Amino acid sequence: MALWGGRFSQAADARFKNFNDSLRFDYRLAEQDITGSVAWSKALVSVGILTQDEQLTIEAALNDLKLAVLENPEQILQSDAEDIHSWVETQLIAKVGDLGKKLHTGRSRNDQVATDLKLWCKQQGEQLLMQLDKTQQQLVSLAREHQHTVLPGYTHLQRAQPVTFSHWCLAYVEMLERDFSRLTDCLKRLDTCPLGSGALAGTAYPMDRTELAHTLGFASATLNSLDSVSDRDHVMELMSTASMSMIHLSRLAEDLIFYNSGESNFIELADAVTSGSSLMPQKKNPDALELIRGKTGRVFGSLSAMLMTLKALPLAYNKDMQEDKEGLFDALDTWSDCLEMAAMSLVGMKINEERTKEAALGGYSNATELADYLVAKGVPFRDSHHIVGEAVVAAIAKGVPLEALTLAEFKAFDVLIEDDVYHHLSLDETLAKRKAQGGVSPVQVEFALTNAEKRLEERDTSGISIRAAR
């Protein structure tokens, strides 16, 4: 049943109907549409459109419909309704007769869909907060387990300075913390209720929109009806947050793919998140991580499409805005799936500590320590940098690490070098010196790890829904 047939003398062309209808994707808003309709029925009592008994009849029918939808949402797709709003109204009328025709009084699909979408974003956003938290918890657990596991640090994919596996884990904990903060901010900004804004000019019925907003769990009502039905900032913000987080997940995936390679041999991923080859029986491929990396572009694409769709749209509602849902659903579904796979990939991962230490000792990654050693002896850093560069060339020519050069060979580069240089070039000393806040020294890693554990432990997730939006 179309909700707008009276103006037209001819039926819509079937091809146009197929092009125009949105039920095939906005059916995912069924639960939110029903929830909004129950709240609207209560508001209609306050302005004398429905009696209390009529409202209770409508609410009971809508609640029955919601239960049926939650049990089998795909049943909706068997209908030829234009959209989820039409489907819900048709089902309600089938249950309660002409009484159901009163429900849409004073309401437009414009404020209705804006409300449905915000309700969906709130629910799905809260679920994503839980998933971010879970991934952080897994990283922190791994960091605690491998607090003293040495790992080569890289710049330009060249070994640069030694770090620890714990320090590496905590780097991604910080990235996901920013994602958590961004998502929290998004959810705060979208926590306003558009219902009661009508098509664009506001409803003609003097209901209390603040009470209506609170009934639906929003912090407040929106302040401008024209903006309310036009606003899709929350869609773009959530997609932007998803895109930023996917960058972090993609970098995590790429690091682990590199560490898992035969050339690095730093880690071995669990069988549960890898697959094999149809031809090469020896292969164990990091497919979960590669898909995280690959799906990142998919999320970026959804954001880009949404930005282009809304650019230069006139106020208020335009049919272009129907394009907000598929990209949003796909972007947040993809982000959710990738968070789950990232957390799973960290479980059961074996770390080859001997190999990571061997790699950390190679590549002359203690060269900076020799430069700092000379600085402590009074040599200007720029001069010490040049001296150490020459020493590295000599060590490479000899085929030995820096610390294998003899004292006489060191003194050929600078007479200030003494026996204590070997202590300064040791791996333990290299790590221990990085004791400024945020550094890789054991003291600072313990400090950062303890703070991360405390932060996650004290995080209040009690008000977060544990059920994802469909």
Curated annotation (Swiss-Prot):
CDD domains: Argininosuccinate_lyase. GO terms for biological process: arginine biosynthetic process via ornithine; L-arginine biosynthetic process. Pathway: Amino-acid biosynthesis; L-arginine biosynthesis; N(2)-acetyl-L-ornithine from L-glutamate: step 1/4; Amino-acid biosynthesis; L-arginine biosynthesis; L-arginine from L-ornithine and carbamoyl phosphate: step 3/3. Its main location: cytoplasm. Residues 1-470 are annotated as: Argininosuccinate lyase. Pfam families: ASL_C2 (PF14698), Lyase_1 (PF00206). One of its GO terms (cellular component) is cytosol. Keywords: Acyltransferase, Amino-acid biosynthesis, Arginine biosynthesis, Cytoplasm, Lyase, Multifunctional enzyme, Transferase. It is found in: Cytoplasm. GO terms for molecular function: argininosuccinate lyase activity; L-glutamate N-acetyltransferase activity. It comes from the Bacteria. Its EC number is 4.3.2.1, 2.3.1.1. InterPro entries: Arg_succ_lyase_C, Argininosuccinate_lyase, Fumarase/histidase_N, Fumarate_lyase_CS, Fumarate_lyase_fam, Fumarate_lyase_N, L-Aspartase-like. It catalyses: 2-(N(omega)-L-arginino)succinate = fumarate + L-arginine; L-glutamate + acetyl-CoA = N-acetyl-L-glutamate + CoA + H(+). In the N-terminal section; belongs to the lyase 1 family. Argininosuccinate lyase subfamily. In bacteria which possess the bifunctional enzyme ornithine acetyltransferase/N-acetylglutamate synthase (ArgJ), ArgA fulfills an anaplerotic role. This is Bifunctional protein ArgHA.
